[in-house]
Amino acid sequence: MKIMLVRDRNVLNNNWLAYFANLLHERGHEVVIACDTYGKLGVSAPGHELEPGVRLANVNGKTSSPLQNFWRRIRCKALPSWHLFDRLIKAEKPDVIICYFPVDLYNVTRFQHHNIPIVQMVHGYPPMILDKVLHKNPLSRAFCRQSFARINTWQVLMNSYKKEIDPFFAPQNVVRIANPVKQYAENEMVDLSAEKKRIIYVARIEKKTKRPHLLVEAFAKIAAEFPDWKVEIWGMRKYPEYEKEINDFIRAHNLTGQVALMGYTEDVEGLYRRADIHAFPSASEGFSLAIADAMSIGLPHVGFKDAHSVNEIIVDGHNGFLADNVDDFAAKLKILMKDKELRIKFGYNAHEDMKAYAPEILMNQWEELFQKLCPANPDTKK
């Protein structure tokens, strides 16, 4: 079966997209990643390169012609690309189109008349991804609605998200397929018996959703009791004013030697192995691979009870704790910091819980979906 994955830009630096495309390819599918970018293709991280059999089709990519590049640079910024995707779809003739974001759906539907089944992914809490469409002007909403009507299946990451798509989008078929999670044998798990006295948070350093400042505030309440413990926040740094707020708080509360913003790293697994606790104060997630991967390797977690997805992956009192507020977050951290055996217990439970998201299981669910969308295709694996 030929599958077209569509994401308009920042393709190569999306580790999950590369992983998913490679898994499809390993199962015998022909995979084409279609994008529309002149200067934002991205760079693959080591270990996350596309397999040689996965093809990349960039409708606005650079060429060897300076004149053509000048035109493509203008076209990419100023003009829609629907006709370019229409041409690509006619040439490739995919069996299924999978759209990463709503903008990708527009690119493969507007002023196009193909009847290829379309799967729309929702990589987050649906209202956060989709509700911005509801605030567009009436004409724009009408155009958007025409595109959304072309969707055969919506794919969400949590069961609770099935009911969170607004009726405006008229979702007819919504399935839950979570992200596949890397699996570790028991002898590959993090060694929590060797105490590192380190709490980590792996997420981009951003205020509205990821909220690392809440972890810093929580730790400040108990730091004096645990002078040997450290908090490290690892993730992409794009907001210097927000970082200044956090660093000012760190200095004001004499936490300079205990709390640090560490920035981006490609060795995330190494971070997990050097930690005792993964604290995750995010307000909302789709299906956080940062949580899932850390659980799979055996780390206990602390999150917030009102955080979408976080409050389903973290099971309170089983593989971690869920907190009501910052004070409670601090209290839950304190319990785990004082009790190594509890950390080991929660970490093992987390490791076991992630077996339900093994790549083989999740990719079988995708195969079942493809079978429903293209029942006559002999290449669809049952």
Indicate residue ranges for each PLM-predicted region.
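Short His-centered aromatic/hydrophobic patch
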Residues: 99-105, 122
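Glycosyltransferase donor-sugar binding loop
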Residues: 35-41, 202, 230-245
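Conserved acidic donor-binding segment of nucleotide-sugar-dependent glycosyltransferases
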Residues: 305, 315-327, 335-341, 355
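Membrane-proximal helix-turn-helix segments that form the acceptor-binding/catalytic region
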Residues: 86-87, 136-154
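A conserved mid-protein helix/loop that constitutes part of the nucleotide-sugar donor-binding site
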Residues: 14-19, 197, 206-221, 231, ...
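A short, active-site helix/loop in glycosyltransferases that binds the activated sugar's phosphate group
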Residues: 106-109, 146-173, 181-183
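Short hydrophobic beta-strand element within catalytic cores of glycosyltransferases
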Residues: 300-304
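Aromatic "clamp/platform" in nucleotide-sugar-dependent glycosyltransferases that forms part
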Residues: 264, 283
